[in-house]
């Protein structure tokens, strides 16, 4: 009889392009830094923090407090509408399944 031996798994050979990977990481870092800055400005606006850096960034982005608060108000209205829509959809589905049983 033939003795059992371990399976041979194919080795994965990878050659990463260093320039491409470095550019990808750099672009990703810039994007995340921008997201953090915007998040800080939004949090500063919501909690009415009057910090010099937040005000400077707000001026650089040409955004006023009222504009950000209007955006959040609109987002809240749409979130409520979507919540009500999906809640009604689930209730209708349960009601129809209950009738069929």
Curated annotation (Swiss-Prot):
NCBIfam families membership: PIA_icaD
A GO-annotated cellular component: plasma membrane
Major location category of this protein: membrane
Gene name of the encoded protein: icaD
Its job: Necessary for the synthesis of poly-beta-1,6-N-acetyl-D-glucosamine (PNAG, also referred to as PIA), a biofilm adhesin polysaccharide. Is required for full IcaA N-acetylglucosaminyltransferase activity.
Name of the protein described by the UniProt record: Poly-beta-1,6-N-acetyl-D-glucosamine synthesis protein IcaD
Subcellular location: Cell membrane
InterPro entries documented for this protein: IcaD
Protein's membrane topology: Multi-pass membrane protein
Cysteine pairings via disulfide bonds: none
Coiled coil (residue ranges): none
Endpoints of the signal sequence: none
Keyword terms, alphabetized: Cell membrane, Membrane, Transmembrane, Transmembrane helix
Similarity section: Belongs to the IcaD family.
Disruption phenotype: Deletion of the icaADBCR genes leads to the inability to form biofilms, produce PIA or mediate N-acetylglucosaminyltransferase activity in vitro.
């Amino acid at each position: 009889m033939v003795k059992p031996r371990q399976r041979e798994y194919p080795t994965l050979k990878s050659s990463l392009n260093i320039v491409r990977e470095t550019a990808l990481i750099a672009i990703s870092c810039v994007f995340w830094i921008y997201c953090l800055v915007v998040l800080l400005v939004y949090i500063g606006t919501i909690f009415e923090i009057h910090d010099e850096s937040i005000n400077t960034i707000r001026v650089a982005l040409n955004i006023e407090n009222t504009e950000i608060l209007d955006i959040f108000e609109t987002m809240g209205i749409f979130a409520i509408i979507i919540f009500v829509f999906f809640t009604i959809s689930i209730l209708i589905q349960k009601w129809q399944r209950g009738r069929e049983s």
